[in-house]
Regions:
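Glycine- and aromatic-enriched membrane alpha-helices
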Residues: 2-465
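Positively charged, small/polar-rich N-terminal and surface patches that mediate targeting and assembly
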Residues: 411-415, 430-589
Length: 589
């Protein structure tokens, strides 16, 4: 009798833990939001947060309508999918509420992986559509193959918590999406033949927030990997491997980036922690501490290689490293089951699989793992490519050039800034690291208005203050540009007829050119060259001609070529003669 009571209590405890684990996985959405927003620029932070929210909102709706039954329903078509049912509406009394919620939060994780790789240039409406497709069709069907009693489960394929079903699938969607979408403006500089000659770094605006996101994700991962455990030894072992793998991955990445780039790369190490977590997700129940350490070590190197390969070989712009973290390490973690599965792990007996190659089990399990990866990858590539293609040909995937340059917070959501009360939005557009970023068109006459404005920004206070100050028709034009442009702009203004120019050299700050600074393996141009400020007061020459002349002269096709400020002048007095306004300027202009 006592044993029966203890068994019943044990079952109830793990049933509660199962739901606590689901809550921890839900909390991971906050981690993804923090990571992605921290790794991207401030002008898109609100957009990133909104997309991470929509993953769960849209995913929940899609899940109870169709996704849950496709994954959890009885096998149809020889285990290809679950049968469509509406038990959540028609048979609620006998419905498996816990399984519904637990698998829902996993589904949301798959969808949210994609947003980081496609950040800063994707239409919000398009994002909502493909997020819905992933949650309704792509994830539920392939997850059924492994976790819903489908053909992969029957074959002996093993993915305990989602290296394959969640992370590889999300990573493949991210890769194809980023590739079809194209890079952010200025990420890659190309020569006349179209060959990439330089890769530019776009550092995230807040690594502190990104680090917080990593810690939130790591905490959530204990639920992600551990929630399905049904006994204490297995749960303890899962917690151990889930701790060891990311720790080793981060240390290996630290050492490698320190040796390769001269300094340990903060953002790369943050990615390495996540890479180790992704890789250990599939084998966490069937491997031991040694296996977890090796899996983590490979992850720490794989994430660095993946980010480098995307930047320098594939030329796929992935702002947060989602492809390297999730796709590559999802594949590696799934393969690792066939290498490091051992009968000494508490969860091995429950898994019902063969031991790994390195533990005397031969190639049997490894072949099953490779087969599962291949089938799942093929399904994902085909379905997400069709999805993105249809979206691209209908509502479009990418925002306009002007919207991208201004920032999606403003253009997609009407937010002047995600940081109300702080001038981060304005600062982000003129950050040192963004200066000299190529806009893709060096000819002023061929450049779009958005590129012209990004290169030489104009703030016309005469128009803004019209009606609030005395209008004399006199304007002060202030031009801030690089010191090297002085002779060129001086001659252009002189040819225009502007001769009275006040010039001030502005003290630059930052790291001098030639210093080797790296961000995620990409060399940064941290230089803020000495600048000059030119001030002219014009009355007879139309101010628009002065602005246009300055813009055309300063434009080189890169962000930060110059800034122009125009202020209305309410009174001018020549001290020597007492002349005022127009008369005071006759021998100056």
């Amino acid at each position: 009798m006592t044993q029966e009571i203890l068994s019943a209590l044990d079952g109830e405890v793990f049933a509660v833990w199962f739901l606590i684990g689901a809550a921890l996985v839900f909390w991971m959405q906050a981690g993804f939001a923090m990571c992605e927003s921290g790794f991207t620029r401030a002008k898109n932070a609100g957009n990133i947060i909104m997309k991470n929210l929509m993953d769960f909102w849209i995913g929940t709706v899609m899940w109870f309508i169709i996704g849950a039954s496709l994954m959890l329903g009885d096998n149809v078509m020889n285990g290809f999918a679950g049968g469509i049912s509406f038990d959540v509406f028609t048979n609620y009394k006998n419905f498996d509420y816990s399984a519904f919620v637990f698998n829902l939060v996993f589904c949301a994780t798959t969808a949210t992986i994609v947003s980081g790789a496609m950040a800063e240039r994707t239409k919000f409406s398009s994002y909502c559509v493909y997020s819905a497709v992933i949650s309704a069709i792509i994830y539920p069907i392939e997850a059924h193959w492994t976790w819903g009693g489908g053909f992969l489960a029957q074959w002996g394929f093993h993915d305990y918590a989602g290296s394959n079903c969640i992370h590889m699938v999300g990573g493949i969607c991210a890769l194809i999406g980023a590739w079809m979408l194209g890079p952010r403006i200025g990420k890659f500089e190309r020569d006349g033949s179209g060959k990439v000659k330089k890769v530019n770094a776009f550092p995230g605006h807040n690594l502190v927030i990104a680090a917080l996101g990593v810690f939130i994700l790591w905490l959530g991962w204990y639920g992600f990997n551990g929630a399905a455990a049904t006994d204490v030894p297995t749960l303890g072992s899962v917690f151990l491997t889930t701790t060891v793998a990311p720790a080793v991955a981060t240390v290996v990445c630290l050492i490698f980036t320190w040796a390769k780039y001269g300094k340990p790369d903060v953002s790369m190490c943050l990615n390495a922690s996540l890479a180790g977590l992704v890789a250990i997700t599939a084998p966490c129940d069937v491997t031991d501490c040694f296996g977890a350490a090796i899996i983590g070590a490979v992850s720490g190197l794989l994430v660095v290689f993946g980010i480098w390969f995307n930047d320098y070989k594939a030329h796929v712009d992935d702002p947060v490293g989602a492809v390297a973290v999730h796709m590559l390490n999802g594949i590696w973690g799934t393969i690792a089951v066939g290498l490091f599965a051992t009968s000494t792990a508490p969860g091995f007996a429950v898994a019902g699989i063969d031991e790994g190659l390195f533990y005397g089990g031969g190639f049997t399990q490894l072949i099953k793992q490779l087969g599962g990866i291949g089938v799942t990858a093929l399904w994902t590539v085909v379905t997400i490519t069709i999805t993105f293609f249809i979206i691209k040909k209908t509502i479009g995937l990418r925002v306009s050039e002007e919207e991208e340059i201004v920032g999606l917070d403003s253009t997609e959501h009407g937010l002047p800034s995600a940081y109300s009360g702080f001038a981060i939005m304005d600062i982000s557009n003129t950050m040192d690291v963004n200066e000299n970023t190529n806009l893709g068109e060096a000819d002023y006459d061929k450049a779009s208005e958005a590129k012209r404005n990004a290169s030489v920004h104009v703030e016309n206070m005469s128009e803004t203050l019209q009606g609030t100050v005395m209008q004399t028709g006199i304007n002060k034009v202030v031009i801030i540009t690089k010191l090297s442009m002085y002779d060129k702009i001086k001659k252009a203004l002189n040819d225009l007829g502007v001769t009275g120019i006040t010039v001030t050299q502005v003290t630059g700050c930052g790291i001098q050119k030639g210093s080797s600074q790296m961000y995620r393996g990409v060399e940064m141009d941290m230089t803020l060259l000495p600048k000059i400020k030119l001030e002219v007061v014009v009355s007879q020459i139309p101010v628009d001609r002065v602005i246009e002349t300055a813009k055309k002269t300063l434009y080189t096709g890169k962000i930060g070529d110059g800034k122009i400020f125009v202020y209305p002048v309410s009174k001018v007095v020549k001290i020597r003669t007492g002349e005022e306004d127009f008369a005071a300027l006759q021998d100056v202009e």
